[in-house]
Amino acid sequence: MKLSVSPPPFDGAPVVVLIAGLGGGGSYWLPQLAALEQEYQVVCYDQRGTGNNPDTLPEEYTLAQMAGELAQALTAVGITRYCVVGHALGALIGLQLALDTPDALKALVCVNGWLTLNAHTRRCFQIRERLLHAGGAQAWVEAQPLFLYPADWMAARAPRLEAEEALALAHFQGKNNLLRRLNALKKADFSRHAARMACPVHLICSADDLLVPSVCSSELQAALPHSHSVVMRQGGHACNVTEPETFNTLLLNGLASLLHSHEPAL
């Protein structure tokens, strides 16, 4: 699997791995790259079956496979100790890494993640799946911004949304791959395992997230033994895109706090 690895800003710089959500593309994190690369060696990637890592995913694709593929790719380029910043599905992959490769994961930032799928989030995905089956990629892509962005933000950026839609259609991951990744996401449940996650976790969520209610982060924090959280007042599901200055400050402060906190013995 191809990775994009930035040069370290100084010798011994910590490594931060960025994991996108269901869309899978590493470009999702573009608003964060400049700020992060001043202090960290940053790894971005397109998840298997998306972007520049095209593949046909197996029918019973799992979250554990997603995490394993990333861990293997990082090891292959000599990265054996790192922090993860994950958004939604990316946060779930980070949680899976915390279980499966605890010696490798120094710290985790979960953005709009969850412990187990909330009934509201399930409803949103059911609606989106119906749109996909009825109207194909076009319908999925056209509806996507409604779940990602606040209404006022979208209303002020119609040309940008049109350009994003065209790009998303041109690079659509394919119906089968999308549904297999989505099924893996829906099956994820950390409620029985969160208590044994040893790495420190910082949670960021947005109070106006339409897709993943902010209570999901509260539930996740309550289940994780070494965690703290912050709630953005606005920004929607893609709060790192719509409110990058606020988000980047919270992210950098959160990472600094995690890396300077006492890591529990593994």
Swiss-Prot record:
The keyword Methyltransferase does not apply. It catalyses: carbamate + 2 H(+) = NH4(+) + CO2. It holds the Pfam family Abhydrolase_1. Its EC number is 3.5.1.-. InterPro entries: AB_hydrolase_1, AB_hydrolase_fold, AB_hydrolase_sf, Pyrimidine_utilisation_RutD. One of its GO terms (biological process) is nitrogen utilization. Keywords: Hydrolase. The keyword S-adenosyl-L-methionine does not apply. One of its GO terms (molecular function) is hydrolase activity, acting on carbon-nitrogen (but not peptide) bonds, in linear amides. It comes from the Bacteria. HAMAP family: RutD (MF_00832). Involved in pyrimidine catabolism. May facilitate the hydrolysis of carbamate, a reaction that can also occur spontaneously. Belongs to the AB hydrolase superfamily. Hydrolase RutD family. This is Putative carbamate hydrolase RutD. It comes from Enterobacter cloacae subsp. cloacae (strain ATCC 13047 / DSM 30054 / NBRC 13535 / NCTC 10005 / WDCM 00083 / NCDC 279-56).
